[in-house]
Curated annotation (Swiss-Prot):
Lineage: Eukaryota, Metazoa, Chordata, Craniata, Vertebrata
Pfam families: BTB, zf-C2H2
Primary localization class, coarse: nucleus
PANTHER family reported for this sequence: AGAP004733-PA, ZINC FINGER AND BTB DOMAIN CONTAINING 12
Protein name, UniProt field: Zinc finger and BTB domain-containing protein 12
Domain BTB: residue ranges: 33-97
InterPro entries registered for this protein in UniProt: BTB/POZ_dom, SKP1/BTB/POZ_sf, Znf_C2H2_sf, Znf_C2H2_type, ZnFinger_BTB_dom_contain
Residue ranges covered by zinc fingers (C2H2-type): 333-356, 359-381, 387-409, 415-438
Length: 459
């Protein structure tokens, strides 16, 4: 642009408000309306661009469903939905105080954060009312009647002490946050939890393939961290600390280690995803006592996990099978899954892998019944996110987590509690609900649903 060109700039005051008024007038006359929102008996004709700009939920719905009619399932009256949709055009919302929780929940469902924030601020006035209300001429009876509408939903409000400045409103109590919090959890926070809970739902095919055999000395040298044996196997303070302790208390260097070896195994279901694990088997010798102790410690750790011990984040170790304390690696040990007895923990570990199909994660010590579960678990440690959302572009490690994430875009809640008929968009959410509220498992929930269906058919 030439430097001598003069530019005129006009700011049109009130343009946004005038445009919305004109759009609302066109909506009332049903002109240029390109979508109909259906909720029970309500049929709201409007414009996609206006509704999508005010509600990310509706925006995602329009992207997934390009038709001219959209069904919205809300557990509220059609009047509440109509008021919220109309506020997209008018910028105003008016309702009775007793309905504030219903409007807050419905606005949270539609992801209308500006309405949610206003409802929270208004609700905080009833949680801790200010003393100045009575001094301004508001009678005590009217104040009590205003608070009684929400008394059944709120905890008892504490009496504030007189002060020149009223205290800031407290955060919203848990009972009011629960509907919002349960429906929109963070996907990345649930990813590792969902991976752990879904590990037993894959196919029963075992596809282990041994690709390399190394001696115990080679493996110990490759896995040994710079600071010593305390962080063995890359487990960092949890399993690694226990392996380091066992390695230090192992046989002296002059002692000849028992026959043993280490197999590095590769587990994979596809070319672009694979996992690694360690398997101890008889055969081969290690000439260094510390190396022998490390391998024995890994075997003890695997045996402890097989006996019900925990080598996860808690770092606790369960009792070893057959009362094995780690002092004598050649002591007879009984398998916890069958009546067989073995001399030496390394033979027990080999037996458990060969006969009982137990796979172990070399990063955290978690054990799996199938290599596919280990393969999927290892992707979490690697940070591999090969499943992406086609709507917002967010990536996930697990395919099941992506499916749950898509439920937020579509508004679907496919997971239903058979005990209280509450629905959830995320599988980990219903698992947590069943455990905390009913003390049940997912299998018991499915069984309860089947029993209820049978009862309906019989009647």
């Amino acid at each position: 642009m030439a430097s001598g060109v003069e530019v005129l700039r006009f700011q049109l005051p009130g343009h946004e408000a005038a445009t919305l008024r004109n759009m609302n007038q066109l909506r009332a006359e049903e002109r240029f309306c390109d979508v109909t929102i259906v909720a029970d008996s309500l049929k709201f004709r409007g414009h996609k661009v206006i509704l999508a700009a005010c509600s990310p939920f509706l925006r995602d719905q329009f992207l997934l469903n390009p038709s001219s009619e959209l069904q919205v399932s809300l557990m509220h009256s059609a009047r509440i939905v109509a008021d919220l949709l109309l506020s997209c055009y008018t910028g105003a919302l008016e309702f009775a105080v007793r309905d504030i929780v219903n409007y807050l929940t419905a606005a949270s469902y539609l992801q209308m954060e500006h309405v949610v924030e206003k409802c929270r601020n208004a609700l905080s006035q009833f949680i801790e009312p200010k003393i100045g209300l009575k001094e301004d001429g508001v009678s005590e009876a009217s104040l009590v009647s205003s608070i009684s509408a929400t008394k059944s939903l709120l905890p008892p409000a504490r009496t504030p002490k007189p002060a020149p400045k009223p205290p800031p409103p407290p955060p919203l109590p848990p009972p009011l946050l629960r509907p919002v919090k349960l429906e929109f959890p963070l996907d990345e926070d649930l990813e590792l939890k969902a991976e752990e809970e879904d590990e037993d739902e894959d196919e029963d095919v075992s596809d282990i393939c041994i690709v390399k055999v190394e001696s115990a000395l080679e493996v110990a040298h490759r896995l040994k961290p710079p600071g010593g044996l305390g962080g063995g196997l890359g487990i960092g303070g949890s399993v690694g600390g226990h392996l380091g302790e066992l390695a230090q208390s192992s046989v002296p260097p002059s002692t000849v280690a028992p026959p043993q070896g280490v197999v590095k195994a590769c587990y994979s279901l596809s070319e672009d995803a694979e996992g690694e694990g360690l398997l101890l088997i008889p055969g081969g010798r290690a000439s260094v006592g510390a190396t022998s102790g490390l391998v024995e410690a890994a075997a003890v750790a695997m045996a402890a996990r097989g006996a019900g011990g925990s080598l996860g984040a808690g770092g606790s170790r369960g009792p070893l099978p057959g009362g094995f304390s780690g002092g004598n690696p050649l002591k007879n040990i009984k398998c916890t899954k069958c009546p067989e007895v073995f001399q030496g923990v390394e033979k027990l570990v080999f037996h458990m892998r060969a006969q009982h199909f137990i796979f172990m994660c070399p990063r955290c010590g978690k054990q799996f019944n199938h290599s596919s579960n280990l393969n999927r678990h290892m992707n979490v440690h690697r940070g591999v996110k090969s499943h992406s959302c086609g709507i917002c572009g967010k990536c996930f490690t697990q395919k099941s987590t992506l499916h749950d994430h898509l439920n937020l875009h579509s508004g679907a809640r496919p997971y239903r509690c058979s005990y209280c008929d509450v629905r959830f968009a995320h599988k980990p959410a219903i698992r947590r609900h069943l455990k905390e509220q009913h003390g049940k498992t997912t299998a018991e929930n499915v069984l309860e649903a089947s029993v209820a269906e049978i009862n309906v058919l019989i009647r």
